[in-house]
Amino acid sequence: MTLSVAVRKAAATAVLGAALAGCGGGTGSSPKPANEIRTGSPAVPAPASPSAAPSGSPQAGAPARVPVLPPGPNGLTPVFERAKQHGDKTVALTFDADMTSDQGPRAASGERFDNPQLISSLRALKVPATIFMTGRWAEEYPDQAKAIGSDPNFEIANHSYSHHAFKSPCYGLPALDGAAATADVDRAFAAFRKAGAVNTVPYFRFPGGCYDDQALRALSPAKVTAVQWDVVSGDAFAKDPDAVAEQVLAGVKPGSVVVMHCTRSAAPVTEQAVRKVVPELRKRGYRFVKVSELIGK
């Protein structure tokens, strides 16, 4: 390998690492009480009952009524972070299946962006989960996308096709403009359908977790609910599953959304951490649910 090639590869890895860390670190804005619509401006309380996405939305083939939040001020895409709960101790584990549009050569050379052992462990532990998948990931691993999207234990949500940013700057990710952003989301849903995934839902997670009002406005034609998180697992590039588990356990509250990753090369200890987190949270009286159940409360 020449020095220039090595430098380019290192730079690409650094950008990916920052973006994955960003997916678990938020955008610097403080969490808002849910159920609230967060728009980048002051939060506006959502109506008590979320609406249901009509048939023919991107989640076609999923259960007929998938709860979504109503649009925010001026039609901006609503943002969900956690459910406001008083008695029911539920928590949603979410996993970003990250693969960018330019990582095909790395996958071809043997790098693994999937994590089948994680999915197997979630099944064995009987933990429902929401997988925020990029369209490029679904193209690379269509059999896995179909299996995940056909399992009632899971739901597939949209993490863009390309894993490019919807706001700039965002951890060095290339940025999409308004029209390209909507097309990127649509392309991801098309990739899920082509793979044969059925349990897809009209939820979206911004690459890197980066967004502002302009991004929410650009996303509004897709008619999705943006889903962020209130608990950062810190699993991206982590080496110690105990540290990841401890961070999750310290942050979880009733109604929490936990962000983790389903990407073996970039989050190698996630599966081990999950096997530590699940029994401990159950011991504390928590029940695991998909994001759709939290939004529907």
What are these regions (language model features)?
Residues 253-292:
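Catalytic grooves of carbohydrate-active enzymes
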Residues 95-98, 132-136, 159-161, 205-209, ...:
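Active-site-proximal beta-strand/loop segments in catalytic clefts of secreted hydrolases
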Residues 90, 113-117, 140-143, 180-190, ...:
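Extracytoplasmic/secreted proteins, especially bacterial periplasmic and envelope-associated proteins
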Residues 2-113, 145, 276-278, 284-297:
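N-terminal pre-catalytic segment of deacetylase/amide-hydrolase enzymes
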Residues 58-157, 162-168, 172-173, 190-194, ...:
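Active-site beta->alpha N-cap acidic-glycine motif
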Residues 101, 109-110, 133-142, 205-212, ...:
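Acidic-and-aromatic substrate-binding clefts and catalytic sites of carbohydrate-active enzymes
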Residues 210-211, 215-251, 286-295:
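His/Asp/Glu-enriched short active-site or ligand-binding loop at hydrolase and phosphoryl-transfer sites
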Residues 119-133, 155, 173-209, 249-261, ...:
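CE4/NodB-like, metal-dependent polysaccharide N-deacetylase domain
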